[in-house]
């Protein structure tokens, strides 16, 4: 049995937290969790090894802060202290089991409201205009529904086959019925289009202002909704309201992440036509006029937006991909946009399964504006002459595996002199220092080598070549050297994922 979602609750004591967990059985579990780190110790006390062979043991009573005002109290020699407690809890509980859960309740939805000003963040927070309809599709039971504002009382409450139309005489009635329906549906995943930016924040703030904060917060099974407006430090990019206990997956954001191409337009109408052959319902004038003059077509319009979403996922299967990645990284689905969260979780789970404790992240990482050999050109939509396409299979992962790149295999790097990066006042990136390049240079020329501890030494090029060849080091094009006597963790995990990829591709062909 696997998890569907997990959230860190209140603090019970030092490094002791309440965890809210939902698994495939759908039951809400509240579990106490002691967030352990590891500390360096003698060999006879050790239960694990560090990535570089250090002897370590678990510790519960530890302190750590990145804030310079408090860092003097940090426990020295800590390992694996800087991952979110809920993610460490999932790693402890599920280890390297990557199987996604299978009993999610997924709701595709869309809201409509009266037209107003530009949809800025401030405008959405104020939510000044009434919501006129909310449509949804419940995937697990194949049922459709819509709450529609019907001040003229033109409609009757109808349910035909798997589609229900619920008219409401006032917006307050509509919003109250939606809150009740939302609790009844009890979704694990809420899917919309541009919903992280518009639908969810607008709906939340409108319920907040028209009914009450308590009613708005009741959208969460835990009664907790976090918002950028009420939080001093907000770290979620492109998401402004977080309903704790409901995972929001904005299909537009998923498409931008997984499609690997720029679209001429990200309007749902355009994307729907391109990938599903289905457009939005056409009408004359604006939506407000349609709502006033032809409420039946308006209902079709709202349902069609949800239908396009449903068909997009049947075609693109981004939800399944999100689940697979998230379970590999042991994190919630709405965090799939951050690649490092997935990578950190997957690597940590693998290391701990081997009795190795992940190292702490560098508290003072080096930030560089540009990296030689790491230039990426963003695609530009349009028609161009004299272009060709060279598709190298999974270029970056293949480079990582072939060079055996890893934190524990890093030997050092050749420092490129600043003057070599600027020619006639312009930055350049052609500064190759791979083995063959070194052999073409003046063998008596001296270069600076920096080790992983950032200490430097000056060596002749002939000495660097001897170091590389005597130790059978792999060297990247920009002069970074790696050991090859044992596989790095990154190489091991990527090789495993590539093997799985071949299996899945073969199964796809068989199907």
Q: Where do the PLM segments sit?
A:
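Short helix/loop capping segments that flank catalytic or ligand/cofactor-binding pockets
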Residues: 116-119, 144-146, 200-201, 257-259, ...
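Acidic, Mg2+-coordinating catalytic module of metal-dependent nucleases/exonucleases
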Residues: 184-199, 203, 246-343
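Helical catalytic core of nucleic-acid polymerases
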Residues: 392-511
């Amino acid at each position: 049995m696997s998890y569907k979602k997990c959230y860190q609750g209140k603090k019970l004591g030092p490094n002791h937290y309440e965890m809210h967990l939902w698994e495939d059985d759908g039951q809400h579990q509240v579990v106490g969790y002691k967030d352990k780190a590891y500390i360096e110790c003698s060999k006879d006390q050790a239960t694990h090894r560090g990535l570089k062979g250090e002897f370590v043991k678990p510790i519960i009573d530890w302190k750590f802060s990145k804030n310079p005002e408090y860092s003097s109290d940090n426990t020295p020699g800590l390992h694996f202290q800087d991952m979110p407690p809920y993610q460490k809890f999932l790693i402890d509980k599920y280890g390297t089991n990557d199987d996604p859960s299978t009993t999610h309740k997924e709701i595709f939805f869309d809201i409509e409201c009266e037209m107003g000003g530009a949809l800025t963040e401030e405008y959405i927070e104020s939510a000044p205009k009434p919501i006129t309809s909310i449509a949804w599709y419940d995937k697990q039971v194949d049922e459709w529904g819509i709450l529609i504002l019907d001040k003229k009382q033109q409609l009757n409450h109808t349910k035909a086959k798997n589609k229900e139309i619920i008219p409401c005489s006032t917006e307050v009635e509509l919003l109250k019925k939606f809150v009740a329906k939302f609790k009844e549906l009890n979704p694990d995943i809420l899917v919309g289009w541009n919903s992280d930016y518009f639908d969810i924040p607008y709906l939340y703030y409108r319920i907040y202002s028209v009914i009450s904060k308590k009613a708005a917060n009741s959208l969460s099974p835990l009664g907790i909704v976090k918002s950028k407006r009420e939080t001093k430090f907000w770290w979620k990019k492109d998401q402004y309201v977080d309903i704790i206990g409901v995972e929001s997956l904005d299909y537009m954001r998923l498409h931008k992440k997984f499609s690997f191409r720029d679209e001429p337009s990200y309007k749902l109408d355009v994307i729907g036509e391109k990938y599903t052959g289905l457009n939005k319902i056409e009408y004359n004038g604006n939506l407000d006029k349609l709502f006033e003059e032809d409420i039946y077509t308006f209902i079709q319009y709202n349902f069609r937006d949800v239908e396009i979403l449903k068909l997009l996922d049947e075609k693109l299967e981004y939800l399944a991909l999100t689940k697979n990645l998230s379970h590999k990284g042991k994190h919630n689905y709405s965090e799939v946009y951050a690649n490092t969260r997935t990578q950190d979780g997957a690597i940590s789970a693998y290391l701990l399964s081997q009795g190795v404790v992940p190292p702490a992240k560098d508290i003072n990482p080096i930030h560089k504006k540009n990296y030689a050999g790491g230039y990426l050109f963003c695609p530009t939509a349009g028609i161009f002459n004299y272009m060709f396409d060279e598709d190298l299979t999974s270029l970056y992962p293949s480079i990582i595996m072939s060079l055996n790149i890893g934190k524990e295999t890093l030997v050092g790097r050749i420092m490129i002199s600043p003057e070599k990066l600027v020619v006639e006042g312009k930055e350049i990136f052609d500064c190759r220092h791979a083995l063959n390049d070194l052999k073409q240079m003046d063998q008596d020329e001296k270069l600076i080598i920096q080790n992983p501890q950032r200490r430097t030494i000056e060596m002749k090029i002939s000495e660097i070549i001897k170091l590389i060849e005597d130790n059978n080091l792999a060297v990247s094009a920009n002069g970074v050297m790696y050991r090859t006597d044992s596989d790095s963790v990154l190489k091991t995990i990527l090789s495993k994922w590539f093997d799985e990829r071949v299996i899945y591709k073969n199964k796809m062909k068989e199907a």
